[in-house]
Design a protein with these regions (language model features):
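Acidic, histidine-bearing metal-coordination/catalytic regions of metal-dependent phosphoesterases
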Residues: 1-128, 133
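Alpha-helical scaffolding within the catalytic cores
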Residues: 109-113, 137-144
């Protein structure tokens, strides 16, 4: 057995958003969970000025299973399209299985944000930094 520190569980981790081929109208989100999450969804809303988010659009994600020395994990990917250019969106992924037998809907993680690119004639700037390895929740938000 590998290090149990890196074992996947029902809480999503390794959440990564990437621009689509047309960064003005789409993006993709990938994340990892344990094998109990078998109907993953992503929720998406236009990020507004109000704490109320309205009714989110739900996007079904695809899932690939990876077997490793730490057991099986599910790697999910949701492709989002049909978005408006130069618009800030909020998205989130489920913390537990979307539907857990006998428990109804699962809970959702925190809202993350993604801004689509402007039109094709506008220069696009990206910020990239590598894997921080440690203190992701306490230090990374300070960079962003």
């Amino acid at each position: 057995m590998g290090s149990t520190h890196y074992v996947a569980d029902g809480f999503p981790d390794r959440i990564v958003a990437t621009p689509a081929q047309d960064a003005a109208t789409g993006f993709a989100v990938a994340w990892r969970t344990d094998a109990s999450v078998n109907q993953p969804r992503l929720e998406l809303v236009v990020a507004g000025n109000s704490p109320g988010v309205g009714t989110p659009r739900r996007i079904r994600a695809s899932t690939a299973t990876l077997a490793s020395e730490n057991g099986s994990s599910h790697h999910h990917r949701a492709d989002v399209d049909g978005l408006h250019p130069d618009t800030l969106y909020a998205y989130r992924v489920p913390r537990t299985a979307y539907r857990v037998q006998g428990q109804g809907q699962g809970t959702w993680g925190a809202w993350n944000h993604f801004c689509t690119a402007a039109t094709a004639s506008t220069p696009l700037t990206l910020l990239y930094f590598g894997d921080t390895q440690n203190k992701n929740l306490s230090l990374v938000p300070r960079v962003i």
